[in-house]
Amino acid sequence: MLFQKLRKNTRGILIVIAIAFGASLFYTGAMAIMDRQRGKQELAANSIALVNGEPISWAAYQENVYANLRYQEMMGARVNPLMVEAVKYNTVESLISQSLLLQEAKKQKIKVSRKEIDAKLSAIKESFPSAKEFQEQLRGSGLTEAQLRGYLKEQIQVEKLLDDLRNEVRITEEEIVKAYEEVRPAHILVIPEDDTPEAKEQARQKVQELAEQLRQGADFAELARAYSEDVGSKEEGGDLGFVGRGRLVKEFEEAAFALEVGEISDVVETDYGFHVIKLLDRKLAEGDEFLEARDALAAELKEQKVNNKIAEFVAELRDDSQVVIRDEQIIAHGLMREGNVDAAVEHYKAALEGRPDDAYLRASLAQAYLEQDKTQEAIQELEQAVAQADSDSQLHLMLGLAYLQADEEDKGVESLLRASEKSASDFLMQIQISSILQRMGREEASVVEDRIAEIQRLYEEQLKALQEAEGNQAEEETPEGSTAP
């Protein structure tokens, strides 16, 4: 696509992602120009959002949603209908950010020279095999070259605005060192039986006793295997491997990085429970390895800070702006992200009034009900969703889990088995369902395990066939009279 070619000649802007993901520049430019040519009142009536009175059209929004979904699929993501709501929300947010940035660039009267536009246009033309093909694409998009130049001018204005922000960012040597350093902690975790002060104190005392044993010379790995409740690390003697800053919860990270190699920590409390930590090793920012990695790490840190600065800048612009989103489902999704579940439920209900046959909208409402601990209301919505989209295994899985949450075990198992049946070739789905049924001690787990075995058998057959085909091809390519290495 043309826009993908253009991206190679422009700076990446992570905050403005909507159009970048695969949409044609000609299409996007044409949409923007056609939007301007239509009356503002007409466009506002057909818009997904208004940004300081400036409309974002439904057509542009829908094209960007489609482009973003295609991009995720190209990146190997497993896109299912339940994920589309989040893509729609992110697309609207990106288009709003884009509009805010363009409005700010115009407000600042950022100048763009004819030479700069010429350079950008030349880069586009050079990406086509011939001038004729460029003109055909231009005409097919309903654009004139003058209109395209106007669109490119706006793009350059936004790039210059973001360049000003980028140039304000500095990375210190201390930041580079901290980002490079890693520690290798081992830990023993004890989880309180419940949230009562007595249970927490009992868990703390247990960890304190273990810490005292360790200081007296007890083997850390042996105690971790015997007492740690972190199933992911206990069999490794509590060893978490090398981890950098930002990878661990705050309290654990601060304690681990404060230790010397071989030192045992005091009791550390986190949301997971109580820990005692031993530092096994430390990777310092020194030597040839650090020097080789330093420049790339500095560039990565700068990009992170730039993106954070852009996000903060856009948030400030939005605080000073009037933004109206005109889709109840997208509003509800945003409220869910903010943790305002009660308000989200009302907007999901309003959305359903206009789209009562949307199974996935019902699933979103059900998820909100579950957040409110309204399990029966969630089940009612999911039962309707399954009736509307019976072939979707994810909906059956959600319904099964809701039944289990309501202690309706037989109904839950029945729905889980339907989910398994409708996704017979989905290895991850089968593993998830098998794990649930095994934990419940249900004999139906064997049905799912048979499906897992069949998936593995088919995979091994395909792998064997591929290896044989590659072997035959290698033999055919070996010159006669020579010996393959």
In which residue ranges do the predicted regions lie?
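Soluble sensory domains of the PAS superfamily and closely related sensory modules
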Residues: 256-260
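Short acidic-hydrophobic surface loop/beta-edge motif
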Residues: 46-51, 264-270
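Short, low-structural-confidence N-terminal segments
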Residues: 1-89, 140, 319-320, 326-485
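Secretory-pathway/luminal and periplasmic proteins that interact with or process carbohydrate-rich
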Residues: 125-133, 221, 230-237, 249-251
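Solvent-exposed, amphipathic alpha-helical "stalk/arm" or coiled-coil-like segments used as scaffolds
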Residues: 12-27, 81-118, 123, 131-171, ...
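Well-structured core secondary-structure elements of compact alpha/beta domains
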Residues: 63-87, 150-167, 175-216, 229-250, ...
